[in-house]
Amino acid sequence: MAKKVTGYLKLQVPAGAANPSPPIGPALGQRGLNIMEFCKNFNAQTQKEEKNTPIPVVITIYADRSFTFEMKTPPMSFFLKQAAKIQSGSKLPGRDVAGKVSSAQVREIAERKMKDLNCDSIESAMRMVEGSARSMGLQVEG
């Protein structure tokens, strides 16, 4: 028989930098979960990732206070900022251009994000990436 799920918790944790300090400690602690177990497992699974890459995590909490977690790919905005070599997007998207990304970079980002996106083809994933780029004030070339 399957364990009874009591809830889900969504966090964005830097790769290899999970520790019991806020925001992770309080979020897990108030639900009665073992904080150090999560931190050790998460850091072990993200050691191949570049340090401080934000990794979205969905933690499934069970009635017996055990948990499992599923890691997603980093946010699209993180990849777009890396590709454009900028710190943040435009304050006025549509008016100010914060940077430029090529269609090859858009395709690469779409291929990396494909498993987390709700689309069937790489072309539709590319359109989603282009839309995110435009909403950040990035110009898509090509």
Swiss-Prot record:
The SS bond pairs are: none
Presence of the UniProt keyword Protease in the record: no
Report keywords, A-Z: Methylation, Ribonucleoprotein, Ribosomal protein, RNA-binding, rRNA-binding
A GO CC term assigned to this protein in UniProt: cytosolic large ribosomal subunit
Pfam families attached to this UniProt entry: Ribosomal_L11, Ribosomal_L11_N
- PTM per Swiss-Prot/TrEMBL: One or more lysine residues are methylated.
Gene Ontology biological process terms from the UniProt entry:
translation
- Superkingdom, natural source: Bacteria
A molecular function (GO) held by this record is: structural constituent of ribosome
Q: Is Magnesium set as a keyword in this record?
A: no
- What NCBIfam families does UniProt report for this protein, alphabetically? L11_bact
Q: Which family does it belong to?
A: Belongs to the universal ribosomal protein uL11 family.
Q: What does this protein do?
A: Forms part of the ribosomal stalk which helps the ribosome interact with GTP-bound translation factors.
**Quaternary state and partners of this protein?**
Part of the ribosomal stalk of the 50S ribosomal subunit. Interacts with L10 and the large rRNA to form the base of the stalk. L10 forms an elongated spine to which L12 dimers bind in a sequential fashion forming a multimeric L10(L12)X complex.
Q: What is this protein called?
A: Large ribosomal subunit protein uL11
Species of the source: Rhodopseudomonas palustris (strain BisA53)
Q: Which gene encodes it?
A: rplK
